[in-house]
Every structure is written in structure tokens, then in C-alpha cells.
Amino acid sequence: MLTAETIAVAMSGGVDSSAVAAMLRAEGRNVIGLTMQLWNQRRLAGHEGMPETVQGRCCSIDDVYDARRVADTLGIPYYVVNHEERFERDVVRPFVEEYLAGRTPIPCSLCNNHLKFDQLLIVARQVGADRIATGHYAQVVFDESLNRWLLKRPADKSKDQTYFLFGLTQEQLSRTLFPLGGMTKPEVRELARKHNLVIAEKPDSQEICFVPGGDYKRFLEAYLTEQGDERAETEIAGEMVTTDGKVIGEHAGVHNFTVGQRKGLGVATGSPLYVVQIKNDTRQVVVGKDEELYSRTLRAHRVNLISTAELREPMRVAVKIRHKHQPAPAIIESAGPDEVIVTFDEPQRAITPGQAAVFYDGDIVVGGGWIENSTQ
């Protein structure tokens, strides 16, 4: 008689991961619940205008409590693993440094790369699990003709999370399940109700888990104050200039801006202006007209390829430059080790350094990398 496979489910306390645990349990798998405690939500309470109390969101104490209640309902073992130190080192600090350097980071992708599909697999082995499962809306399949594991977009394209998963390796994909890949969100909620899970009606988290209210500027100031770092008020201040080099004002720090931003520029002109570029070396914020936001090419670095081992020749793909961006037709070609040049068929608006460029061949994720720069 075959022994049932043991799956460790990454439980955030939300509907999706809870539904995954219930689904696998109903299938007869041995299920173990794992929650990664990543950030103390009360750590910065009261600093630099941060709220004194913080409501629960992914990774909070309240969410750990919800995950534990779900595990109790399902009758599965449940463990909380503290990774706060590593989360701060690999996610929070890079998030802060990227903003201070004038880039716009994606902490969810950093967390996936360094924690959820790295440390979680290590912990899963330690508790005797064969594989891990998460509540991401994505699909993973093995292609025998390519002899590779493939990452694919989910059935419900409105919930597609593959943009944040481009960094997964073949080893990680081979040991990961995405049970919700063929389901819609309403179906997932109905599944949670069917299993009488207390979180069935819990709202989705819509913000960065460690940034209360999504106010990243306030978070940066509070974190820097706690760390005794004065850069937010000193060396990152600079000039605001037009695309032809005319100085039209000053700014309090490049971390206050992102490419494409219109509001909060602090300058009055006769026509709308947008942030076109942030120059880290001179601390200048360059502003211009909407048409000056469009670029045809970008360079991506730290590229991870999934559907192929290497990019031997130019390849036609569709590319997303932000999570909600409609994939745009383009050609990608190697520009050196772990670097790719992307040339779009049509210019794209507000290509933003620090974001990811993710390459698709239909529903298959070819790979992706971090946007370094763009040119018109």
C-alpha cells in the first residue's frame, strides 16, 4: 500500500492558502501547515506618524491566529517559523535601499525568491514534507519534450500572480504545488465555506504586508529614524529638472517619486508634468510631458529563465513591465550573463527601474529579470 504524500502548505491566514490546505486534506494527502513570521507589525508603531495600532494583514500576529484556527478545524499539524531577521535583511532593507536609490522595488518578488520558495522548502524537509503548496494563482507542469518544469498563467487571468514568481528555479518548481491554478476566486471562497473555515469571507490583502496602509513614504521615514539613518533628509534631496536640463524646483528626496508620477511634484506649470527619470548619481528628478514617458527598449539584469536554459538567439515574447500591465509584444535577446535587452513592437509607458520585466510565450512564463533602465 502506497503511503500518502506529505505536503507542507504555506498558510498566511488568508482565504487562498487556507483553501489549499482544505483541498489537499480532502484529497487524502498528509498536510502540515507552516506560517512564516516575517515582520513585527507593532515594531514601528508611533514612529514618524506611523499608526499606534496596526490591523492584521499578511504575516501579522492576527493572521497567524487565523491560520492556526484553520489548521485546528482541518485537524492538521501546524508550525510557525520565525524568519524576521532574514526577512529584514533580504526584503525590507533592499526595499528601503531601492527607494533611496530612486528605483521602485517589488518586495513580493524578493520575498518569493529569498523566503517563500527558498527557506520554506528547507523547513518543509525538516518537518518531513515531500513538497510545498501555496495559495498563488499560477500553474506548474512538467514538459517531457523540454525536460523542464514550466510556470504557467492560471485559468483566472484576473488573479494571475506569475509576475511575482519569475525567479523560481527548476528545483523549486519541481517541489511546488499551486492547487488554485485552475480555479476562480469565487470558487475558492465557496470551497472555504464548504469546509467551514472561519476565514471564508476574509478580505484579500491589497498592500505590501509590512507597510501599513500602503504608505511607503511614511514607512521609509519611520524605518530610517529607527535605524538612526538620516539619508531621507540629507543626501537624497536634490533638484527637479525638465528633460532639457532646466531647474524648476527642489525635492526632499528621490524616494518620494516613481516614474510616471504626476501628483505631488511640488511644482506649478502651465501643463501637466510627469516624472520621466530619476537620476541616482545626481539626485535629480527629471520631469516632462506624457509623451516623453514612452520607451521602446529596456535592459533587464539578474535574469532567470524558466522555459529554457539559455537564450541562444532573439526570441519573440510578450512582456509585462508591471503587475497590472497587459503583456506587450517584444523581442528579447541576450546582452551578457544574466542580462537581456527587450525591444517592444510599440513604445511602452513609464518603464520603471526596480520593477520586473517578465517574459511570456502564450501562458508560459519564459522568465524575467529586474528592469535596469530604458531608452526611447
Regions found by a protein language model. Name each.
Residues 1-166, 177, 185-188:
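ATP-dependent adenylation/nucleotidyltransferase module used to activate substrates
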Residues 133-376:
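AMP-forming adenylation/ATP pyrophosphatase catalytic core
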